Amino acid sequence: MNHMKRNFEHVKRIVIKIGTSSLVLPSGKIDLNKIDQLAFVISNLMNRELDVILVSSGAMGFGLDILKMDKRPAEVARQQAVSSVGQVAMMSLYSQIFSHYQTNVSQILLTRDVVEFPESLENVTNTFETLLSMRIVPIVNENDAISVDEMDHTTKFGDNDRLSALVANITNSDLLIMLSDIDGLFDKNPTIYDNAVLRENVTEITEEILKSAGGAGSKFGTGGMMSKIKSAQIIFDCDRQMILMNGANPRDILRALDGKMIGTLFAKE
């Protein structure tokens, strides 16, 4: 392993992305303890005068829980309806728990056309800057209720892994921390191979890495390892850094920022 020292003293603005699999228990119930830990960590970072943006999946998972559905509906309209119910519940819970730490949050729902159209991009960028200047944590998700994925009018990002990388770029963030249900990027699938080795540092996306990144997302989410690798490429392309790490204990974010070798660091040499 390459034990390259990690130093994040330059980091002033962070995007944290949490996936559905980190927010929803295997039973389908919401992991309230996880959300509380995440709120504590983000509030702690805000108190250190860092800017923090949270990209949160979970609207579908919350919606399935509230509506007592055991699986994602097949029809797109029903998927969007369930997500719209879940988004309200998710933001309500975030607002309630962050308030325990005297931290205010806001909601920003994005579609791809907003980011690709210069005037709306400028508006949303100004909104991010204003919220952060007011010491408010923007909580970002794709606007699932209205996003479409058709050839003549594509408004979907694909998944929130890609969305988080784009948000890191448009907000000039120094670091993207991607929380997942795995410890980082391995040389092969750790759920199949016991001898899989964690890659502590990745300086470029190689063909070997692309080959080892197959597989789909969880039953509650959409993002598999390939989507994380593609997001890392966006991060490389805009000269930023990314940590892919396990979201089981959000307090590990603080340890990672202190330089501990947690997860996989994607950073150019």
UniProtKB/Swiss-Prot annotation:
Primary location group: cytoplasm
EC assignment: 2.7.2.11
This protein's pathway: Amino-acid biosynthesis; L-proline biosynthesis; L-glutamate 5-semialdehyde from L-glutamate: step 1/2
One protein family per Pfam: AA_kinase
CC annotations in GO: cytosol
One BP term from GO: L-proline biosynthetic process
InterPro entries listed in its UniProt record: AceGlu_kinase-like_sf (IPR036393), Asp/Glu/Uridylate_kinase (IPR001048), G5K_ProB (IPR041739), Glu/AcGlu_kinase (IPR001057), Glu_5kinase (IPR011529), Glu_5kinase/COase_Synthase (IPR005715), Glutamate_5-kinase_CS (IPR019797)
Annotated localization: Cytoplasm
Annotated positions binding ATP: 17, 180-181, 222-228
Enzyme class, UniProt record, top EC level: transferase
Binding site for substrate: 57, 144, 160
GO molecular function: ATP binding; glutamate 5-kinase activity
Cysteine disulfide partners in this protein: none
Known role: Catalyzes the transfer of a phosphate group to glutamate to form L-glutamate 5-phosphate.
Family affiliation: Belongs to the glutamate 5-kinase family.
Protein name from the UniProt record: Glutamate 5-kinase
Organism: Streptococcus mutans serotype c (strain ATCC 700610 / UA159)
